[in-house]
Design a protein with these regions (language model features):
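Conserved active-site alpha-helix within GNAT-family acetyltransferase domains
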Residues: 82, 98, 107-114
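Acetyl-CoA-dependent GNAT
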Residues: 2-74, 78, 82-95
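Short amphipathic helical patch at the helix-1/turn junction of helix-turn-helix
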Residues: 71, 105-106
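Conserved hydrophobic beta-strand within the GNAT/NAT acetyltransferase core sheet
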Residues: 66, 99-104
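Conserved catalytic-core motifs of GNAT/GCN5-like acyltransferases
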Residues: 29, 103, 112
Length: 114
């Protein structure tokens, strides 16, 4: 598995991942618009050239709001979500982000565990 900053060509795969993982997914267009804005930061996890997970944040001054963490159902329970979160925080720290937030639903045990 390789975790890296998201590349523009990965956006269609990330949009497909959103469709699988969320009841109110980001659209491909929404992802493209956010990707183009400097206050957004995204990382992806890939296996054999396929995106199996991604995470994103929105930066305001020195704070980062983690917007999404998604992992394909078939790739879950392998630590990918945790690895994505760590990579996102490390990339955020490179941008002088010093505080990170992540809102989770009460029943989302996987997100709470991160």
């Amino acid at each position: 598995m390789l975790i890296s900053l998201m590349k523009e060509e990965e956006i269609p795969q990330v949009a497909a991942l959103e469709q699988v993982c969320f009841s109110e997914p980001w659209t491909e267009q929404g992802l493209r618009e956010s990707f183009a804005r400097p206050e957004y930061l995204f990382v992806t996890a890939t296996e054999d050239g396929q995106v199996v997970g991604y995470a994103g944040l929105y930066q305001v001054l020195d704070e980062g709001d983690i917007t999404n963490i998604a992992v394909l159902p078939s790739a879950r329970k392998k630590g990918i979500g945790t690895a994505l979160t760590r990579a996102l925080i490390e990339a955020g720290e490179q941008r002088a982000i010093h505080a990170f937030t992540l809102e989770v639903r009460v029943g989302d045990a996987a997100a709470i565990h991160i």
